[in-house]
Amino acid sequence: MLNKLQKFSYGIARLGSSTLLGLFGWASVYVYWGYYNLDPVLTGWANAAGKIVIAVAGFFMGYISDITKTRWGKRKPYIIFGAPLLALAFYMYFIPHHFLGRNVDQFTLFIYAAFFNSLFHFSYAFLLTPFQAWMPEITEPEERIGVSALQNFSNLLANAISVVIGFLLPSILRQDGLALIVLGILAIFEVLLYFPSILFIPKETKTVLQPNFIKDMKIIISNKEYMKWVMVQGLVSVSMTMTLSLVLTYIEKVIGITGGLASLSFGIILLIVIVGFFYVWGRMAKKKGKGKTLFLTNMIFMIALLFTPIIGLMKLPFPSYVLGYLFIVLGAMGASGFHLFPYVIIADLAHKDEIDTGENRAGL
């Protein structure tokens, strides 16, 4: 059992790393394409490299940490080294001109972006996969709801912080000294939030069953419904990530909004609509089913996406930002479903599998 301080230490730790991940998702494309003028194709490849790295690293880190044996336990070493590494990669990614100069060639800038993008995503998997695997080893079932609630609060607060800073980032970057300070504070903030869990939570005493890689893979692949969902979620996730990462660039280059507060207004609306429609889609899912509701959210998102080029291709009889706000609202309504349903559907699949087989494989 964890005491209150230990529960708080574990639950609040992800606030910093989730903030960095959220901000990275919003701004990683904009910074290199819209600010450092890296070719958009190269910018896309640099970001794709990071996604590939986190997919591979996230898959294996759980198994690697399971077989780790140190005086600090299985999980703490990854937290001790992972938190500073994540902060360093985040900081370095956004300030290439301090190391490469302002007149750097495209290829060198691409290599720099791809390396630190990949390092950031590797560090995130290196840190978070063992950290989450730590929970069943240090908590009892009856206290996990409270700890998970703290983590959900941390993630929600992190999303709010990352949206606000993300939409202010173009203005922040134009003031070089301010950018170094803001990015530095965020990086230090992330490291400090993991320190309480390292200091106050003892190493795990319970031993969770050791995984059998081949057996577990056979179980996963044999579950056809789960595999279908993974494929669908993967395709939707790729398109959603690509779209959301271009929001800052779209607002600045297409809509023509460059002021910090004006850009921030788009971010605030985006956040309010996404969170507000959690309730709407949740109510609809109870009445109409999750499948129909998720299909509707994807259709709304697709319609918003199809009409976004209108602002750049047609002369409008009213200010472009009016239509921009409409597209942001529609897109946020669709994105809300993407953020709400995946974990719910995974839980439903795990529950169905437990009923069918009599074995609990939620961890897989």
Would you name each region that the model predicts?
Residues 1-364:
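Membrane-embedded alpha-helical bundles of multi-pass transporters/translocases
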